[in-house]
Structure formats: C-alpha cells, structure tokens
Amino acid sequence: MTDTGTHRPQGGLDEETRQMVVDTVRQLAKRLLTKKAVLAWDRDEIFPEDAIREMLSPEIGLQLLFIPEAYGGMGGGAKDCCEVVREMCKICLGVGTAFFAIQLGSDPIIVGGTKDQKEKW
C-alpha cells in the first residue's frame, strides 16, 4: 500500500488544522506572552491566570483541543496536544505546563466518564 500522506491517526487533527491551532498559539504568544510579561511573572512569582483564561476563552477555545468532536471539541490527539504545548513552552514553561495539565484533566472523563459526564464537562 502506498502512503499518500493523507493518513490521519485516530483521534487526531489533520495537518492543516493542527498548523492552524499552532499558528493561533503563536499569535497569542506574541500578544499575551511577551518577554517582558514572562520575566515579570517569574520575578514576582505570579501565576499568569489572566493570560491562561484568555487562551481558554470561548472565542479561542484551546481547551477543546483534546475533547472529541462528538462533545463539541476539536478531536485532537496526543500529537496535537504535544505540538501546542511545545509551542507554548518555547515562550513560557509555566503556561505550557498549566495548559498541558488542563488537557490531561479531561482525559479521565473522556476515557471513563459516563455519557452524561462527557456531555456536561
């Protein structure tokens, strides 16, 4: 069988969509995760809640990356999550780690939750 390059792993985004999400993260980083802001957070030992909340806002919706499409998410897989987290960590390890923790928090519900729990959360 010849690989046409169109194979999509189960539960993952296609290349075009993944690149669009990564580009969105890069644009957000330029605006929210400036070097000055990141250094101030580190210096003052501040958790950048406002920046993270904006990334998770309904308009942007990065928290939906790992959620199946059947439940209103993007249907991304592990590779997609890693690409997005890697992009965030290039700028601020704290923000990348916080975002990754949010993604991991959805996994128990996706894997073991009831239909009602999946629809609610």
Segments (PLM) and residue ranges:
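N-terminal glycine-rich flavin-associated loop
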Residues: 96-115
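Amphipathic, small/basic residue-rich leader segments at the start of a protein or domain
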Residues: 1-99, 120
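Short, hydrophobic/aromatic alpha-helical segments in well-folded domains
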Residues: 108, 120-121
